[in-house]
């Protein structure tokens, strides 16, 4: 059963833990599984696939390439991107806050 907080965030009980960029999530299955626990109840909230070294290497490579584009992006466009991120956080603040 999926925990209500995960449902509110559009997540399932089992999730890939690593976003690789370019709309791609890691499919690594041999790096282990993380099981976050509610410290109050001891309940496992969900399962998150751990990341491999190859995942991390790819993320760093893509992040470095993305930074080269980001640093040449005009400030107003960067500001708009940050505003959209903040808007998404505000939209989900109650569910995100319950994870803390």
Residue positions per predicted region:
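Terminal low-complexity tails and localization/encapsulation signals of metabolic enzymes
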Residues: 1-47, 80, 84
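Glycine-rich loop-to-alpha-helix module at the N-terminal edge of alpha/beta enzyme cores
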Residues: 45-100
């Amino acid at each position: 059963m999926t925990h209500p907080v995960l449902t509110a965030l559009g997540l399932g009980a089992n999730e890939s833990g690593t976003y690789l960029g370019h709309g791609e999530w890691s499919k690594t299955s041999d790096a282990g599984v993380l099981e976050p626990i509610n410290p109050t109840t001891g309940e496992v909230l969900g399962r998150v696939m751990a990341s491999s070294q190859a995942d991390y290497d790819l993320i760093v490579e893509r992040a470095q390439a993305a930074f080269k584009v980001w640093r040449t992006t005009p400030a107003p466009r960067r500001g708009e991107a940050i505003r959209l991120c903040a808007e998404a956080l505000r939209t989900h603040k109650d569910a995100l806050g319950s994870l803390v």
